[in-house]
Amino acid sequence: MKDFYQYFQFLFFFMLSVISFSLFVALTPLSNVFVFFVFNLLGQILLNVFSFLSFYLIVYPIVNWYAYKKHIFTKRFIFNWNYTVILFFTLIFLIKINSNVEKSYFIKIFLINFGIVLGNFFIFTLLILEFVVWIYLNYVFFKDVNFILDTFKFLEFKIKILFENILSYFPFSNSLDVKKDIKVYGDSVDDLKDSQVFDEKKNIINDEEYQALWSFSAFLRNNKKPSNINLDKTIFEGSDLKEASSLNKDILNENALNLDENVDEIDESCEYKYLDNLEDNKLVISGKVKACEIRTKGIISQVAISHVYNENVALNKKNDSYVIDISVFDQKEIKNDVEDIEYDKEIQKQSMILQETLKEFNINAKLIDIIKGPVVTMYAVRPDKGIKLSKITSISDNIALRLAAIRVRIIAPIPGREAVGIEIPNKRREFILISEIIDSKEFRGDFRIPFALGKEISGENIVFDLVNSPHLLIAGATGAGKSVCVNSLIASIIFSKSPDEVKLIMIDPKIVELKLFNDIPHLLTPVITDVKRALEALRWCLDEMERRYVLLDNLLVRDISSYNKKIKDENLNLMILPYLVIIIDEFADLILSARKDLENLISRLAAMARAVGIHLVLATQRPSVDVITGVIKANFPSRISFMVASSMDSRIILGSSGAEKLLGKGDMLYISSLNPFPXRIQGGFLKEREVYRLVEEVKKFGSPNYIDDEIFIDSVKEPDLVALGPSDEPMFDEALEIVKTTRKASASYLQRRLKIGYNRAARIIEIMEDMGYVGPVNGSKPREVLI
C-alpha cells in the first residue's frame, strides 16, 4: 500500500505538470508555432488527463485517510505533501487566469487588462499567505521549520530513484552504477563523525541495499546466527544484482544460511540481491535478500535455516554416569512465519508513532536501532545535542498513551551507547520455556552451579554461575514469577550436576512450594518447613563452614575449587567437598519470626561461606526495609527483581526504580557485582508436570543420605540421663539391634524409634562409638556401621 500511495501521488503531479506545461506554451510568443501541436496532438492526452483528474479528486481523500489510518506515513509527511498539492493547484489557477487572454504577449496584456492584474495580485497574495500558514502550521503541530529543505531533499531523492528505474530498462545503462551518497552515523567519534559522507563509489550503498542489509542483520539476530553488524558504523561495498536463476547454490550451501530448494518458484517477477564480498568481513554469511517490498515486509523471507547442532537425546556432562534426558522438559513449538510478518508490521507502526510523539514534545531524536525481544521491543533513539534526558523520561506515560501500551520503561542512557532506550511491550507475548535455555550452547559452558535464568531483550540466553554471584536475592510481588524462578534454579542444578557435585538444603515456610523436590539425592535434609528446624539447619551450615575452613587450612589453599583440584592432582586420600546451596523460598516469614538469630546467621554465612562453597539463595514477596535490611543487601550483590507495586520497593531491591514498570509472568531485572546496571530478562517458564518428570528421573540415581537428623534438637525437654556405659543404659541393647538392622547410626533416628530425648539418644551413639560399633562423625556423610 505504501508504494501504491507513492505512485498515486507521483501520477497526480505528473498530470499537473503536463497541464502546466501545455498552458505555459500557449502563453509564450512561440505559441504560434507550437499551438497546432499542443492543441491537436496533445488534445486527446489532455482530455484523458482531465477526465482522470476528476476521478482522482474523488479518490484522493480516501487514499489519504487510509494512509493515515494505517500509519503508512507520518502525519507530518501526509500534511506537507497535501499542502504541496494545494500550492500546485494555486499555481495552476494562476496560469489558467493568464491563459484566458487571447493576445500572445504576456507583459502587454498584464499591463492593459485590469481584471487580469487584479486576478494575479489576488493569486500572488494567496500564495504568500499559504506559505506563511504552511510554515506556521508546521511549527505549531510538528515544532519544525526545516521541513521545506527536507521536502526538497526528499523530492530530489525520489527523482534520482525515478531516473535510475527508467535507465535500468535500457540495455546500454545499468542503474546500479548510479550510486547515491548516504550519511553514515558512527557510535564512536574515532571511527566516524556525525554527518560524514563517503564519496568513494565502492564504499557507498544505495537506500535499498541499506534496508536489505539492516533487515538481514535483524534476521540473523532473531535466528541466533553469528553476526557482528552495526550499520551505523560499518560501510559496506556495493552488492551485485543477479537473477534468481543465476545464483550459485554451491556457494550458498557452504554457509549457515541456505536457500530453499524451490527458490526458482518464488516470485520470479522480483529481483534478488546476492550479498557477499562485504568490507572488513563484518558479515561473513552470504544470503539471498528479496529487494522488492523490503520496507513493507521488514524481514528477509525465503531463507531456510539449516540446524547445524541439534541434540535432543541427552546432554553430555563431566560426570558421564549422571545424564538426564532433555525430553523431561517440554519442547518449544515451531514459530508461525505469518505471525512474524504481522509482528514486524506492528513494530514499524509503533516506531512511526513513537517518533511522532517525540516531535509533539519538541524532542528531536533519531531512531537508530530496533531490538526485538520476547516480551518487549526496545527502540534506541539518539537525541540531538542539548536535549535533557529528563525531558525524555518524563513523557513515558504519554508514550504509553499514544501506543496503547500497559507500561513503558525508558533507559536513559543505554550503558555504553550514545542512545536512549524506550522499551515497549509487545502485543503478542512470547513465552520462554526452560528447555530453550538448558538445551543451548550457553548452558553447556563451564559452570560449577549453573542457573538457566532466561532470555534478554536481544534474544540471547542468559546463564550465570551461582559461584560467581556468590549469593542471590530474589524478590517480587505475588504472581510475578518468583516461585517459578526458584524452581528453575533448582531444576538447572539437579539437571546438570550430580549429588556428589552439589548438595541442597531447602527451607520452605509456605510448606507447598518446594515439597515437589523431596527425596532427591541432592538433599542433605528433607524440605524444612518449621522455623526452629530452619534455624538449627543454618547453625549446622555455620559449623560446616568452619569445618571446611579447617580442611582448606590443612592443605594451604584459599577456596574450595583449589582444594578439590589439589586432591585430584596429588591423589590425596581425602574426600571431594561438594558445593552447598541453601535455598529459602519465603525469607520474610522466617526473619519476622526470629529476626535477631536469623539475621546473624545469614550475615555470617553470606560474608564468609563463599570461599568454602556454601551459597545462599533468598526469595521473598515482601520487599520491605524490615525484611531486606542493609546488612543483607550489602552481602547480596546479585539480585533479581520481578514486578513490584511501587518504585520504592524497586529501590529497596535494586537500588533504583524500574521494577514497577515490569509486566509480570517472569519479566525481571537482574543486577550482579559484574554488571550493576539492571538488565531486563524474560525468565524461563517451568510447568509443574515438568518438575514431576525431572524429579522422577533424578530419583533413579539414588536415594538421599540425610545427615541433618543429628542437627535437630527435640523441642520436648526431659531430664538428662547420665549413662557411663552399656550397663547403665537399659535401652542400649535395643538401640544396638536397631542400628545393626537398619545400618543407620543417627541420634535423631534412635530418638524417633525409641521415643526418647535427643540428649539420651546422642549419648547412646557415643557409647557405640567408644565400643567400636559405629564410626566417628564424617562431615556430611552418615556414620559408618562397623558391626
Curated annotation (Swiss-Prot):
GO biological process: cell division; chromosome segregation
Top-level taxon of the source organism: Bacteria
Alphabetized UniProt keyword annotations: ATP-binding, Cell cycle, Cell division, Cell inner membrane, Cell membrane, Chromosome partition, DNA-binding, Membrane, Nucleotide-binding, Transmembrane, Transmembrane helix
Compartment annotation: Cell inner membrane
Transmembrane segments: 10-30, 33-53, 77-97, 109-129
Main location: membrane
CDD domains recorded: TrwB_TraG_TraD_VirD4
Domain observations: Consists of an N-terminal domain, which is sufficient for the localization to the septal ring and is required for cell division, followed by a linker domain, and a C-terminal domain, which forms the translocation motor involved in chromosome segregation. The C-terminal domain can be further subdivided into alpha, beta and gamma subdomains. The alpha and beta subdomains form the DNA pump, and the gamma subdomain is a regulatory subdomain.
Alphabetical list of PANTHER family matching this protein: DNA TRANSLOCASE FTSK, SPORULATION PROTEIN RELATED
Subunit record text: Homohexamer. Forms a ring that surrounds DNA.
Protein name: DNA translocase FtsK
Source organism: Borreliella burgdorferi (strain ATCC 35210 / DSM 4680 / CIP 102532 / B31) (Borrelia burgdorferi)
